[in-house]
Amino acid sequence: MTDSLSPTLELAVELIKRPSVTPHDAGCQELLSQRLQTIGFEITDLPFGEVQNFWARRGSQAPLVVFAGHTDVVPTGPEEKWEHPPFAAEVKDGVLHGRGAADMKGSLAAFMTACERFVKKHPNHRGSIGWLITSDEEGHAVNGTVKVVEYLVDKGEVIDWCIVGEPSSTHTVGDVIKNGRRGSIGATLIVKGVQGHVAYPHLADNPIHKAAPALAELANEKWDEGNAFFPATSLQISNINGGTGATNVIPGELNIMFNLRFSTELNADVIKQRSEAILQKHGLDYDIEWRLYGEPFLTSKGPLIEATQKAIKHVRGSDTTLSTSGGTSDGRFIAPTGAQVVELGPCNATIHRINEQVLVSEIDQLSSIYEHILEELLVVGSE
């Protein structure tokens, strides 16, 4: 079977067959590291807890262009509902099926073969190439990229440009690249009351009744107008839980969870201050715990955006759209170091779904795009 596969597809198949459900790596990183060592990369394994990470670098000079990605995948859901077994990596009618095909083992394979071709053609390229790989992107994301970035900062490593292999495309590979992401902050709110009998409300204090106007104001708050790169900030209440399950008992507390996806017009401190001002305005007795998942980041212009646009135009013959839509990515840990960051990967229509799949032609084209980005950044004008 493998005789008929392109090098990129062959590697993608090998990776998908390793059931690396987060935070497990299932040997994917060992496979990648061995390939990278063969073409002159120095490998540093960086395990934290049960999470596997590695940093690889070829070259010692600036500028440094880094590929960031993850080997872990989300759980499959009921395997009997898959048309093709999720870890069989079956190829049929030009489509690669399997968990991780689009998110993001196809990208890992594409960048690997791009690097192999690039190094063979340009063994004395300027600057350096790095790989930052984790098995903790789809899970808690506490022992993965964020820890590797801390290690790199402590070592004095400076990333100039970073390509994150997240599935950014919508209809065809490269039609959309992410040049930023909104910030994400979540809150767990406990509104306190006094439990009692519904027939004697004067002897109780109903936290649901007290919280309702405050929650309505939070939900309707106009946080900002957004800007040219980001939509307006959005707050969504995701969980509300209160009561004993009985109809005749006023609950003693109400538990609420909400999340804000915010633009560069705001920061986490301002969100906390404005949210709690609303809670206090309504006289609530409450406890609140905040968790910042990431500040917003943006690469509005520069060599990385230009190189990516040129590469897509060269391979696909089409222009690309810059976007900051969607959820968070590990780019949020890399951008604060000062690096320019873009996300470029396959189409995302089936990510995290049953029957995840990617067109074989997409990952082959993606490999060519990655190779041309490297040439634009590390070759053009230097040879």
UniProtKB/Swiss-Prot annotation:
It catalyses: N-succinyl-(2S,6S)-2,6-diaminopimelate + H2O = (2S,6S)-2,6-diaminopimelate + succinate. It comes from Hahella chejuensis (strain KCTC 2396). PANTHER family: ACETYLORNITHINE DEACETYLASE, N-ACETYL-L-CITRULLINE DEACETYLASE. The keyword Transcription regulation does not apply. Catalyzes the hydrolysis of N-succinyl-L,L-diaminopimelic acid (SDAP), forming succinate and LL-2,6-diaminopimelate (DAP), an intermediate involved in the bacterial biosynthesis of lysine and meso-diaminopimelic acid, an essential component of bacterial cell walls. GO terms for molecular function: acetylornithine deacetylase activity; cobalt ion binding; succinyl-diaminopimelate desuccinylase activity; zinc ion binding. The keyword Transport does not apply. Coiled coil: none annotated. Transmembrane segments: none annotated. Pathway: Amino-acid biosynthesis; L-lysine biosynthesis via DAP pathway; LL-2,6-diaminopimelate from (S)-tetrahydrodipicolinate (succinylase route): step 3/3. HAMAP family: DapE (MF_01690). Pfam families: M20_dimer (PF07687), Peptidase_M20 (PF01546). Its cofactor is Zn(2+); Co(2+). The active site is at residues 72, 137. Zn(2+) 1 binds at residues 70, 103, 166. This is Succinyl-diaminopimelate desuccinylase.
